[in-house]
């Protein structure tokens, strides 16, 4: 089905939940603590879709590998989770990642655009053996 009638324009839909599923599966396989976490910027479907995928990737890993990795920050059944309420504050990204780390998470996937850079800064300070970040929507290398 072609939605756009402009000949040199193509619309595209990316299944973010599928990419996040793979990230969750990978996180479940890499965690040393058995706890991973996620948080969002704003509670909207483009964000919660990522969080759903991450959660279900961890759950699939658990079912296939006999592990019991726990996901903090999101419940796909109730659609309840952790949200900063913005996509700008690096301080919030740092604080949310710190809280998840303090609860045992050694891998965190912020779904909050540039807010995740605050989480990445915390991971850089703690060291990658302590905390790993899965980046979304922003260049995490800066």
PLM region spans:
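A residue-level marker of the well-folded mature domains of exported/periplasmic proteins
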Residues: 1-142
């Amino acid at each position: 089905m072609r939605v756009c009638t402009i000949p040199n324009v193509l619309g595209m839909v990316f299944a973010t939940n599928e990419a996040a599923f793979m990230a969750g599966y990978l996180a479940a396989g890499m965690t040393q603590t058995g706890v991973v976490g996620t948080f969002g910027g704003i509670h909207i479907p483009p964000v919660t879709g990522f969080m759903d995928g991450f959660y279900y990737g961890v759950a699939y890993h658990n079912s296939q590998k006999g592990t019991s990795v726990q996901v903090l920050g999101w419940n796909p059944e109730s659609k309840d989770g952790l949200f900063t309420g913005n996509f700008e504050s690096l301080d919030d990204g740092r604080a949310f990642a710190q809280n998840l780390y303090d609860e045992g998470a050694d891998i965190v996937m912020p779904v909050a655009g540039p807010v995740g850079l605050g989480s990445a800064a915390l991971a850089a300070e703690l060291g990658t053996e302590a905390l790993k970040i899965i980046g979304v929507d922003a260049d995490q290398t800066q």
